[in-house]
Swiss-Prot record:
SUPFAM superfamilies: Zn-binding ribosomal proteins. GO terms for molecular function: structural constituent of ribosome. Keywords: Ribonucleoprotein, Ribosomal protein. It comes from Synechococcus sp. (strain CC9902). The keyword Transcription regulation does not apply. This is Large ribosomal subunit protein bL32. Belongs to the bacterial ribosomal protein bL32 family. Residues 1-23 are annotated as: Disordered. Residues 1-15 have a biased composition (Basic residues). One of its GO terms (biological process) is translation. The keyword Ribosomal protein applies. One of its GO terms (cellular component) is large ribosomal subunit.
Length: 58
């Protein structure tokens, strides 16, 4: 016979939410860092292709 599961406690729910939000914050921080390095021209850790047509249009 099917039995309903126990309710997840608020503490566990908040802990999972904090972990999820923390991972998102780290990803956002890394994205901002990469964006800043690309704009400043100091990007060394990855290849950022720049086509000549984009420069001509700007």
């Amino acid at each position: 016979m099917a039995v309903p599961k126990k309710k997840t406690s608020k503490a566990k729910r908040n802990q999972r939410s904090a972990t999820w939000k923390g991972k998102a914050a780290i990803a956002a921080k890394r994205a901002m860092s990469i964006g800043k390095s690309v704009l400043s021209g100091r990007a060394q850790g990855f290849v950022y292709p720049v086509s000549d047509t984009d420069e001509a249009e700007a």
